[in-house]
């Protein structure tokens, strides 16, 4: 309340926040008077939402889990499901058993893209029951990818353009046998201009941009032409590039040519990570919610929400650095480690008057603070949440648009812990006082009341409390369910974009950040990445073996990495060289260690997502190899101490 303006505050949300907590949180921020609601989606799938909203009128995927069992083609792009979405491996295995052909487009030969060994005995039924001990004993998995395309980072648009160029050539030879002309004529706009654009794209631009051969592209096109029901999956390997939105719209162009949306076994599938990052957006966690939502929110609670756009994550960091935002509130998450340009972001956080975090465990964001810092411990979702009206449950929305209940069963770690909804409601009541029109105590006492308000404000939640007690349910998705595209013109759009060649100067490499297998987002559980053969360390740079030799380096050598962005340089020291099956001129490092190399000013067009997957770097032998060895020893010692704690 001491701030000069409500816009001097920012309310950040982690994707682990429940629907009920998120709804209360955005209501608190807007009754306070600001739309400064940055969230973790700004760093990951913001590009997906921007791309899909323009193309098909909804920022979510358009497939169900059941669709995977009916797809005959699945294209996995910029995603490593074995490490980042392990539960998806069962879905892909079932799809393979149902006859699907899988094409993987990824710079790295990830084991999780190649095969799956399912450790769950319940997945083996009937005649397959005896396969379980045999597969476990001899380590025999189910092959996944039928074709792997080792493109360069950000080569996806060029690869897709090449696939469609091959398909167009066949369609012109045999009209009506490759493209779904009836669907295109009935449900889309801009097809003729887009097809002309494909014809005009030279093959040398496609091959240079993708890093693939004509034969590899032809092989993928032949698979696509045989398939009648295609699903395209993608994750941050696509969303964190300068042209990420355009690339995802190229995926939609590919799907639209075959009519692969709005029918069983087909559609776009952006695969999100956190358990409720999609649900938080549905609940209103966004700095620029539409007028329809804001009008209904204001009507439900009898106030006038602020209508000017707020700040996203990158804009919030810059505003803190400039002194425009003086109060930062984090509802979960690890903001410092999730964001780019670590040193810049740290100084921005330290420029605040007050930083506060609601958390279940300590993380690095609690160490880099404003002048005053608060840590508000809260119940984990696995713990019993008992309020005035009795035991409570919350809900989340997954990547398929399914609303699931979540109820804790463990005794709370402390009798003093409060739940996220209770903390938000208590803070809102104390902060807003007589200004509020909300019965915050009543919401905290019984989450059914929160869900009643959600039902009144957000479409698709009719009879929310009754339905969620009966079963999980899908939210409506008109693009998927009715082939209705609410994008302003009522038809799915073919959108034309140019291929970015991303040419490098001699001695430069294109770096992308990735996660290890012992890691979930910013939470690091150990120093091993067994699927890539890395043990006891994370400061690793994966390089093509020929690049290692050509640059005079050796496996295991310590090097310093320098990023280059518009005349700016940033340095990350003491990384160990690790040869890997990755295209020449390309490298990979672990997130968040390499976030220091990502410029705060390098963001995707239209989504403002940090460009963490195409960072231009140079590599030099470490200036202080002895210090690098000492740092490694300290890391190993600290890791051993953590493991040996009782």
At which residue positions do the language-model features occur?
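Cofactor-pocket helix-loop regions in the catalytic cores of large enzyme subunits
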Residues: 1-272, 298-480, 536-573
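Structured loops at beta-to-helix junctions and adjacent beta-edge loops in soluble globular domains
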Residues: 14, 235-237, 271-273, 378-379, ...
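Surface-exposed loop and adjacent secondary-structure segments within mature catalytic domains
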Residues: 122, 284-288
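Long, low-complexity segments enriched in small/aliphatic residues
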Residues: 246, 441-530
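Flexible, small-/acidic-enriched active-site or ligand-binding loops
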Residues: 276, 526-537, 593-605
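Basic-flanked hydrophobic alpha-helices used for secretion and membrane insertion
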Residues: 572-581
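Short, solvent-exposed secondary-structure boundary/capping segments
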Residues: 581-594
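Long, low-complexity intrinsically disordered regions
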Residues: 606-646
């Amino acid at each position: 309340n001491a701030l000069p303006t409500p816009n001097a505050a920012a309310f950040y949300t982690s994707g682990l926040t429940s629907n009920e907590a998120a709804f209360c949180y955005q209501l608190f921020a807007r009754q306070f008077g600001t739309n400064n609601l940055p969230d973790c989606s700004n760093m990951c799938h913001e590009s997906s939402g921007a791309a899909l909203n323009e193309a098909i009128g909804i920022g979510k995927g358009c497939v169900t889990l059941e669709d995977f069992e009916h797809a005959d083609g699945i294209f996995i792009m910029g995603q490593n499901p074995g490490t980042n979405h392990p539960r998806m491996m069962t879905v892909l295995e079932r799809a393979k058993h149902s006859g699907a052909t899988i094409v993987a487009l990824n710079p790295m030969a990830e084991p999780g893209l190649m095969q799956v060994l399912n450790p769950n005995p319940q997945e083996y039924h009937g005649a397959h029951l005896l396969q379980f001990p045999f597969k476990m004993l001899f380590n025999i998995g189910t092959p996944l990818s039928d074709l792997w395309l080792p493109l360069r980072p950000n080569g996806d648009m060029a690869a897709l353009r090449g696939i469609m160029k091959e398909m167009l050539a066949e369609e012109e030879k045999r009209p009506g046998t490759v493209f779904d002309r009836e669907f295109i004529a009935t449900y889309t706009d801009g097809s003729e201009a887009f097809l002309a654009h494909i014809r005009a794209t030279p093959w040398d631009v496609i091959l240079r941009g993708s890093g693939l051969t004509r034969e590899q592209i032809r092989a993928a096109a032949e698979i696509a032409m045989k398939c009648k029901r295609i699903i395209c999956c993608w994750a941050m390997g696509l969303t964190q590039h300068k042209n990420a939105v355009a690339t995802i719209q190229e995926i939609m162009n590919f799907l639209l040519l075959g009519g692969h949306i709005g029918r069983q076994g087909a559609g776009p599938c952006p695969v999100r990570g956190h358990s409720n990052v999609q649900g938080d957006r549905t609940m209103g966690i966004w700095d620029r919610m539409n007028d329809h939502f804001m009008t209904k929110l204001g009507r439900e609670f009898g106030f006038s929400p602020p209508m000017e756009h707020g700040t996203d994550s990158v804009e919030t960091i810059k505003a803190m650095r400039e002194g425009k935002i003086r109060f930062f509130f984090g509802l979960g998450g690890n903001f410092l480690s999730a964001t780019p340009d670590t040193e810049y972001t740290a100084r921005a956080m330290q420029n605040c008057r007050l930083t506060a975090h609601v958390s279940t465990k300590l993380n690095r964001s609690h160490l880099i603070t404003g002048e005053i810092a608060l840590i508000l411990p809260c119940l984990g979702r696995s713990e019993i949440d008992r309020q005035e009206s009795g035991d409570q449950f919350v809900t989340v929305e997954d990547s398929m648009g399914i609303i699931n209940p979540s109820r804790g069963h463990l005794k709370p770690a402390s009798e003093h812990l409060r739940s996220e909804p209770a903390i938000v409601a208590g803070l809102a009541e104390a902060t807003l006082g007589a200004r509020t029109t909300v019965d915050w105590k009543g919401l905290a006492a019984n989450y059914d009341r929160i869900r009643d308000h959600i039902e009144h404000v957000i479409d698709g939640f009719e009879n929310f409390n009754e339905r969620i007690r009966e079963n999980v349910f899908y939210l409506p998705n008109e693009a998927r369910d009715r082939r209705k595209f609410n994008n302003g013109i009522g038809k799915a759009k073919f959108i034309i974009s140019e291929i970015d060649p991303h040419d490098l100067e001699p001695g430069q490499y294109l770096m992308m950040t990735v996660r290890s297998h012992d890691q979930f987002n910013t939470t690091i559980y150990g120093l091993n990445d067994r699927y890539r053969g890395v043990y006891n360390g994370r400061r690793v740079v994966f390089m093509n073996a020929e690049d290692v030799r050509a640059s005079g380096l050796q496996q295991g050598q310590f090097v310093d990495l320098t990023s280059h962005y518009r005349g700016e340089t940033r340095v990350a020291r003491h990384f160990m060289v690790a040869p890997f099956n990755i295209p020449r001129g390309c490298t990979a490092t672990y997130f968040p260690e390499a976030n220091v190399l990502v410029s705060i000013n390098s963001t995707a067009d239209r989504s403002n997502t940090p460009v963490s997957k195409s960072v231009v770097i140079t590599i030099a032998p470490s200036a202080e190899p002895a210090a690098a060895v000492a740092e490694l020893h300290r890391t190993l010692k600290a890791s051993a101490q953590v493991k040996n704690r009782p």
